[in-house]
């Protein structure tokens, strides 16, 4: 009888492992297909290339797609875990959700951590070096020579990074155990290195997210149709049509020898056509789209941003009075045993919305920073090297998103797998400083955003607008006379 029970337990464990592997494969396959379509939408359409370059580009494309799929999985990790916990609480004995259990969720967290390390330290460096390699001098040109050069570059890069990490760990901890841990690569150095990368990702999120939260209002304003208050769209369309016709006549009258003027006029004509298209779209929009959707979206963004800042402020107070508020504090009751949100399913849904909102804001803020402005992908005109850089950046941001969400108190869901083992998560001063900086910087960015109009008027009243300050430089560019002599006041 005991032998039959043992066999039955082994069979059940085997079926459970097969089921979890199948679910993980299907989820990743869906993310991979979506990521492939996203990258091919932005990737520059390559010209006729040699077979060797085509193979290299194809391999780099597959590796970049894999990395972007892992990034999407890391973003969905925390929301999927939160909603799974609430579903297991609401339907504990339901036959159709038996596949959803703690073992599956723990497995997803472990796979996300493993693949993030693999992409960050192996696949993306390999894709970059493979794309830039030409083979060592003296060797026969071909795929093998490029692979050999890539592997040598990866080996040198690994030695350099491990040396830097070993020196940093030895400086931080002078204990003999830290010196001897050089021989324990898997147990110490890779987790320590990923902990450093996670901290850098959280610092990058700390820089990008507040900027993105304030920038989201501008981005949504560009995507939506604004209300036409005290505006005559017909007159504006008539003026822009005259300007378009004037530019077209000037282009037809210029000779082909004046190449510089032709290119300048073509660019000006393209800008005028774009502006005309936007005005026509605003004119064709329905009344409810103009007068209801835009204000509702702006109010929704303001509410989400305010709730995020309030949650961070509450988390700061909890950190000061309760040590269990630390991200690396005591372990929770486990998945499916208790709700981690005060308001149950509604609170969990709000947490998921805020997590996605913070991720979108961080991406918007990342591409809004001047230092990363050249990284912005363009449709059908993004080189493979730039795609690799974008995939690495998105991977760093998405891998740090669960850590940032837990550190800021957006959710109380415990970090699973290697995400909850970072040493700096147990440092009270680092966590408290992170929360304070996020709240202060976000508040300052929002105040700067909503007081920009008043500030510009004060600058003009005091005569400071002539100093070419950052806020007034954009206005001066938009008010610059166009090529045909008309002032662009639209």
From Swiss-Prot:
Mode of membrane association: Multi-pass membrane protein
Gene Ontology cellular component terms for the protein in this record: plasma membrane
Pfam families assigned to the protein according to its UniProt record, in alphabetical order: LMBR1 (PF04791)
Record topology, Cytoplasmic segments: 41-62, 132-151, 209-291, 361-383, 448-490
Entry's localization field: Membrane
Family under the similarity heading: Belongs to the LIMR family.
Protein name: Limb region 1 protein homolog
Gene name linked to the record: LMBR1
């Amino acid at each position: 009888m005991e032998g039959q029970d043992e066999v039955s337990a082994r069979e059940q464990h085997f079926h459970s492992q097969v089921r979890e592997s199948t679910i993980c494969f299907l989820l990743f396959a869906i993310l991979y297909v979506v990521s492939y379509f996203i990258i091919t939408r932005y990737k520059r359409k390559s010209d006729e290339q040699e077979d060797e370059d085509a193979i290299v580009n194809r391999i780099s494309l597959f590796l970049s797609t894999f990395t972007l799929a892992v990034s999407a999985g890391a973003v969905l990790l925390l929301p999927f875990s939160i909603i799974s916990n609430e579903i297991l609480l609401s339907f504990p004995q339901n036959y159709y959700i038996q596949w959803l259990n703690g073992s599956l969720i723990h497995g997803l967290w472990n796979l996300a951590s493993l693949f993030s390390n693999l992409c960050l330290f192996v696949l993306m460096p390999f894709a970059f070096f493979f794309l830039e390699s030409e083979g060592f001098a003296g060797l026969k040109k071909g795929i093998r020579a490029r692979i050999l050069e890539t592997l040598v570059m990866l080996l040198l890069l690994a030695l350099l990074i491990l040396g830097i990490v070993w020196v940093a760990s030895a400086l931080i901890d002078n204990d003999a155990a830290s010196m001897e841990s050089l021989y324990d690569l898997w147990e110490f150095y890779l987790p320590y290195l990923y902990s450093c990368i996670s901290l850098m990702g959280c610092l990058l999120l700390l820089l990008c997210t507040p900027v993105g939260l304030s920038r989201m209002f501008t981005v949504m304003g560009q995507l939506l149709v604004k209300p036409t208050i005290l505006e005559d769209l017909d007159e504006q369309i008539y003026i822009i049509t005259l300007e378009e016709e004037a530019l077209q006549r000037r282009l037809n009258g210029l000779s082909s020898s004046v190449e510089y003027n032709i290119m300048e006029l073509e660019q000006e004509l393209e800008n005028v056509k774009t502006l005309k298209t936007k005005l026509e779209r605003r004119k064709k929009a329905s009344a409810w789209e103009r007068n209801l959707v835009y204000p509702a979206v702006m109010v929704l963004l303001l509410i989400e941003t305010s709730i995020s800042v309030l949650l961070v402020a509450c988390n700061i107070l909890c950190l000061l009075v309760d040590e269990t508020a630390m991200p690396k504090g005591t372990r929770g009751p486990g998945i499916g045993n208790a709700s981690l949100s005060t308001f149950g399913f509604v609170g969990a849904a709000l947490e998921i919305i805020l997590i996605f909102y913070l991720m979108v804001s961080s991406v918007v803020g990342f591409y809004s920073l001047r230092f990363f402005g050249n990284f912005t992908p363009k449709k059908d005109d993004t080189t493979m090297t730039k795609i690799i850089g974008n995939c690495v950046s998105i991977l760093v941001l998405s891998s740090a998103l669960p850590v940032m969400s837990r550190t800021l108190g957006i959710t109380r869901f415990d970090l699973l797998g290697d995400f909850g083992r970072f040493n700096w998560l147990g440092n009270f001063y680092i966590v408290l400083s992170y929360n304070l900086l996020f709240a202060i910087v976000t508040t300052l960015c929002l105040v700067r955003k909503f007081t920009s109009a008043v500030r510009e008027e004060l600058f003009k009243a005091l005569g400071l607008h002539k100093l070419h300050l950052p806020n007034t430089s954009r206005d001066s560019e938009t008010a610059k006379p166009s090529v045909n002599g008309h002032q662009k006041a639209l």
